[in-house]
């Protein structure tokens, strides 16, 4: 017999307990005790940025909790986030809002983001508090780290890129926070800076980089840099950069130094991909007693049939290269481009050499040697060892972090503009990912757990 839902008249009174409506295994319930501990000193941290008089503001803890909800469930639009918190019981419970409590207006987030939150660097503070909670839970071993970067598309059209000299920065439509941040970065460096403007720049988000790294499609983007502990893939540090390989590699040193200063953690080994295998980075790591399990960024091999660079033997005692016919290539000691010394053969030796046709078309042969070639040689010696293979497998953990962020959290494109906006979004993403890792490791179902949805 077909049933019918009865009762057109709603009840006048309900006995309702919001606490009992949230399942025991709900993500927000598992995360809640961690967030409560992490945000314990939030008001104290933000107190200097609020006035002692005037109307009470929106509770900053409420805004942080709402942002955590948004990044947990891929709701990065603050307007939509406010609508979802208004309707969703679990979101209300996590944000400590009763059924009759009013949800803050979406504009509140913009005002605080560009003011108190950035001035106090509160998102960085929350991120570091979550990392310390992971350390207290024993999830961070501090023995091996992995580093990598992923491109996140900027909120800028890839069809509207222009040369810098084509843009009038004084135009009214260019008076935005992102443009002001970009111009002030040059003012801070001074007139003698060696920094050059890129060939293509976005008029609306000039801090982003013109890149073809992601999906081989040219676009404007930012580099999301993660430094993780390979034990449980906890994100130890995060850094926002333009999506350029040079900036991403430089961020590695920033994150490792900051991690050592903030948490007292220095890894014994670091794993990364070939982009980080430059002589400069390898030498820096060895100088800090960190073993680099990183493939070396090798010189391009010749494809014209001439003798490759490997055919020349380096004599460390005499500081010369020996060609296949036994002649030396010497250097003047001059460092070119801040990284290499050139070793040149004698034109007379080359003229009389029967192997010249297979060696060079020039009057002499030149071999470039990195000033940190010893560090490169050491990194090469690690290739193929069991430790190297194990570290290479652990590198997948940081790549999985990026995949999880883009697929599960739908974080494929920026919503905010400017490097500060990217920094805010990346810190929130890392906070949520670490919270989920910690909650999954710590949570244990209560005995005879029964998920009750009735009051």
What are these regions (language model features)?
Residues 1-15, 166:
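Short, flexible loop/hinge motifs at secondary-structure junctions
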Residues 4-5, 74-87, 97-455:
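Anion-binding and metal-coordination hotspots
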Residues 24-68, 73:
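Basic, short loop/linker segments at the boundary and entry of helix-turn-helix/winged-helix-like folds
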Residues 69-72, 87, 91:
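Amphipathic alpha-helical interaction surfaces
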Residues 92-96:
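Short arginine-rich
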């Amino acid at each position: 017999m077909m049933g019918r839902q009865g009762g057109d008249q709603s009840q006048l009174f309900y006995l309702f307990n919001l606490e009992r409506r949230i399942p025991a295994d709900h993500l927000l319930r598992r995360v809640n005790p961690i967030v409560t501990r992490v945000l314990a000193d939030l008001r104290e941290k933000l107190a200097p940025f609020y006035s002692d008089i005037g109307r009470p503001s929106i509770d900053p803890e409420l805004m942080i909790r709402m942002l955590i909800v948004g990044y947990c469930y891929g709701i990065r639009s603050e307007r939509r986030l406010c609508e979802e918190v208004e309707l969703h019981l679990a979101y209300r419970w996590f944000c400590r809002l009763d059924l009759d409590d009013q949800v803050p207006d979406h504009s509140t987030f913009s005002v605080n983001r560009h003011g108190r939150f950035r001035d106090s660097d509160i998102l960085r503070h929350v991120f570091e508090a979550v990392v310390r909670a992971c350390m207290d839970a024993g999830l961070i071993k501090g023995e091996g780290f992995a580093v990598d970067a992923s491109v996140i598309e900027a909120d800028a059209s890839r069809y509207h890129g222009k040369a810098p000299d084509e843009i009038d920065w004084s135009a009214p439509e260019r008076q935005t926070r992102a443009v002001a941040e970009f111009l002030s970065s040059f003012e801070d460096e001074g007139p003698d800076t060696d920094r050059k403007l890129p060939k293509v720049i976005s008029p609306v988000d000039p801090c982003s980089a013109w890149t073809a790294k992601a999906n081989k499609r040219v676009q404007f983007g930012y580099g999301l840099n993660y430094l993780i502990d390979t034990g449980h893939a906890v994100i130890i540090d995060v850094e926002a950069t333009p999506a350029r390989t040079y900036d991403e590699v430089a961020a590695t040193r920033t994150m490792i130094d900051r991690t050592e200063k903030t948490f007292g953690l220095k890894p014994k080994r670091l794993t990364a991909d070939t982009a980080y295998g430059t002589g400069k980075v390898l030498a820096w790591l060895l100088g800090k007693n960190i073993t680099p399990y990183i493939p070396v960024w090798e010189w391009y091999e010749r494809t014209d049939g001439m003798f490759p660079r490997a055919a020349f033997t380096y004599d460390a005692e005499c500081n010369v290269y020996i060609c296949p016919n036994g002649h030396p290539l010497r250097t003047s000691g001059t460092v070119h481009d801040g990284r290499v010394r050139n070793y040149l053969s004698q034109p007379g030796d080359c003229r009389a050499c029967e192997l010249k046709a297979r060696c060079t078309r020039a009057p002499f042969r030149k071999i470039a040697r990195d000033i940190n070639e010893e560090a490169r040689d050491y990194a090469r010696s690690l290739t193929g060892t069991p430790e190297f293979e194990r570290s290479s497998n652990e590198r997948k953990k940081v790549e999985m972090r990026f995949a999880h962020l883009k697929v599960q959290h739908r974080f494929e494109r920026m919503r905010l503009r400017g490097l500060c906006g990217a920094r805010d979004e990346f810190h929130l993403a890392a906070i949520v990912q670490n919270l989920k890792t910690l909650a999954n490791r710590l949570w244990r179902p209560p005995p005879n757990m029964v998920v009750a949805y009735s009051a």
